[in-house]
């Protein structure tokens, strides 16, 4: 079918929707060409099948295609049955050259390990090289598997299955017959030990365990990611659910550019789009006109004409309000026809992006690691000399594998001139390529010349990682001078050492001894020592001195205790009584005072703890009651409520008893009444009896009895209200003996008098008062103490404590103890954590009597002798004191000696400012090597460092790495050492001269590794993009166009980058540590270009581009262009993630979503409009408002475009019902209520929630009429001539309530019929010309805002007329 007839056909089709509906659903009959199939004689795989079915569908319709598909299925089954295709173990053919490939890899890795051992490369470079070697071997093995099957067994079942696309892919076949390859550990790091076998050969135990890491990870990932993916889909649906195709053509002139790839191919990116401009070929001939649908044949013609880019219409640039028009959307991919009106394209887009999320996740880890596929390695074809062209600029560069090479800074050409016959080899080198040859150098044939960069700076997303360098031998650390360690303080003031340059750390072998704390070396540095000699000695000395007690040894240590001070209670016996709950200890003094012990012998107590309490019943009451202090009695505010209040001055305590029962039962159980006098033993509530006689007070709440109080005393009925009044205030009065209480009533003893109500009338209750005398000083037993001259001292203190304060009411039935006398321990001049031991000691005179003794002990743990181990050497321990000795302060209790294991020379480490020596080293004879020089003269001096394999001269190679100790005659003594390469910025954990043991960490290498483009990156990356998250360490973006200047200041790690913007304008950009600069000196850059590597912050990109365009262009155009650039970048980024996983999604789906994310702007300054600063509003609306302002001459609103993540965009939709059903329901609804929002039910979700027909698909036609109705003005407004309308000030400009000037006789109607109007006019006597207020209906294109506040007057009028119910 020719393309010229195509546009005409399509437009006629879109005009008559009715005729289209009547036609066959697959495709209208006039489109089926019934073209006969061409004969095809080839193997048909999945791809060919797909195109066959598509061809059939296009040319022969649905019915024929389904019949064809059925026949194909039958054919497949029939022949599969006859061929008996099944998979057996024998079908897994391992390629023969596997062993050769593995051997090559092994050799490469051995060489790398050797380079590492000689300190030529760092640990990181070794690791990278190993992993890259295995990755490459794996790839080569896959090729070999392919070749093997293709050439030797093309009909192999496994090969057919994987190759036809039926099931499985090469990555799985590789694991069956190649090698399983590299695996990751649970932290996601690659283990550099690959699985060399495949499933056919079987795995070793180690390989099996390693591979099970990955398998577990796969299962867990799948489970977690399914949820993630589902949530992503839900957010996408929510943001795009109201995008429906609502019109045929929005008529926009804006478009997006689709560019061909490097090979001039468009693949499927043009198919299904409509052209925005005519496509003209080189000869000026029009290939296709605007609005032509691009089908595959037309796409092929455009490619053939060599057109590099085409402008097409896209949902991104569609100007339809809140929807997409058919022409901008293009084909609906379900049936490759122009999309229908009413199609819910938003939801289709959301599902298309969300659904592959689950597939994404399930692709578990394949190879990971740094892939070298982005760069092409070029080898020399001839032997010859290398020349660079004149404009070549290179700088030294170290590759990730530790190879010294050069990095090209400009584009130039490299030639290899052959030394003999042959053609000159010419090579175009792009900036960023790595060169492995030097200009003027000669190269043999088949040598790697360069790694050519793909030109554009490959944006790798990198992350910082660290790797520890672990020491392989014990010895002393020495730096090479090149490292130049620098002290870097961090925020906390800790200082770390960092290497500034690439260099080596050496460890020179020796026997290192760890010294215990406080051990002092006994030998001098440089002294010769013999096996068994003492190297260091540590002494344990007594801090205070005292009597020594040697305890029995436990395990491998003995305890030496020294009693520094003790305290004995001389006049008290220690008595134990056994009860069923254990032993209770008492102290009994000569005058029969008894103290109950709170601790027991064998325990420890601290300062201020109670040792014993006086057993004393004198202060025990019968019942609860009220506490009153008589004047004179004083207490301290004691710290602990548990122990009560300490008495500071003795005196009298008054106690008024009363019995309180706490009940909490139903009121029906009460057996007495409130105010009644009862006798002792009366049952007050079922099963509860009173202990004393007295007046009852009942407290109840909600028919529940709370408490019953019984107040004992004498009751006197009194009728005089004045007398009663005297005793009602303040809960009664104290009366002394002999005082008159009432006429004719005298107090016999001290009483508390209260007025009470009884069933018989008013009365006075005389309550008895008990007095307790409290002494000034508590009783204190006699003490005897022993104390060292400067040891800690201690004593006992007797304290009286009152349990209650003045005026406190004690609610209780049983009695309470009012006063307790306690013995407290007091220790002085001691550390807070010091404890005192409680012991029972025999009386020196009477052996049968036990006394309580408190002692302060100093304890020393003395270890047994140990035989030598790897780091400590042998130790010998001696205890220098005997049991019962009395020693002085500073006397030695025990010594520990460290003995030498081998003969050698002892050396002490370099010391800094008297820091203690924690290690020492013995250089043994085995740590040096003597090399016989055989008479050759060497230029080596003592102290020089050599590496194994170095040429010593005279045909001698160095047998071992190390340092030259001395050159004597014909022999050379070498101290064995091991070099470790450290890279710049590494953190050094050891200083020059430190002693290290095997397994210690020497340094931490800081390096950047490419994040594995693995799916664990996949979903979170897509989420990051769609949620528009700000990346942690984003790239530095250029803010204004100009020329780059890169400088490297002396002594600084980081280069400085500045952009010369012309006219003396320079902008300097700070480059953070560890950032790679992506631009070179003299390069031209535009606003928004990357200056350093790292992820782009989309918000910053939008802001930068908008600010740059805002000057030369009007704000609206600047916003449109900035949004456009951001949109393409976003679509591209998301596509990259999916493509890297082999998932194809049509661009238009992403465009629909991205359009929703970028549709809003933030108002900066409202100008004369009614918008609010900071408000988020659609760009379209602001444009309309600003156009209106331009007509009226008002100041327009200033705004900046914003990018909203999908969650934010969903919560910021016009429909509050949709937003509330998504997240934060309460907040959304509350805000909507406060703002008085209206929901116009435009999307699908709102309508589903309300329960209406959705405005898509078949429900679209009704919606269509509603749109048309909304577009027309109100009938009343049409008949209006009078200009008496004013705009309501509190409303948004896009929805107006027209209000008449105030008038006395006004009726207000909304949408009335003519007869109603007539009736109203006649009823109110209104003339025809009177103003009528009406709500103006907005036009279809206008925005209907949320806050529509109806005029209260209008509502009242409607209610009066009965056109609106009163309650609505």
UniProtKB/Swiss-Prot annotation:
SUPFAM superfamilies with a match to the protein in the record: beta and beta-prime subunits of DNA dependent RNA-polymerase
UniProt entry keywords in alphabetical sequence: DNA-directed RNA polymerase, Metal-binding, Nucleotidyltransferase, Transcription, Transferase, Zinc
GO molecular function, a single term: DNA binding
A single GO BP: DNA-templated transcription
Cofactor(s) recorded in Swiss-Prot or TrEMBL: Zn(2+)
Gene3D superfamilies referenced in this protein's UniProt entry, alphabetically: 1.10.132.30, 1.10.150.390, 1.10.1790.20, 2.40.50.100, RNA polymerase Rpb1, domain 3 (1.10.274.100)
Its EC number(s): 2.7.7.6
Top-level class of the enzyme under EC nomenclature: transferase
UniProt name for this protein: DNA-directed RNA polymerase subunit beta'
Organism: Synechococcus sp. (strain RCC307)
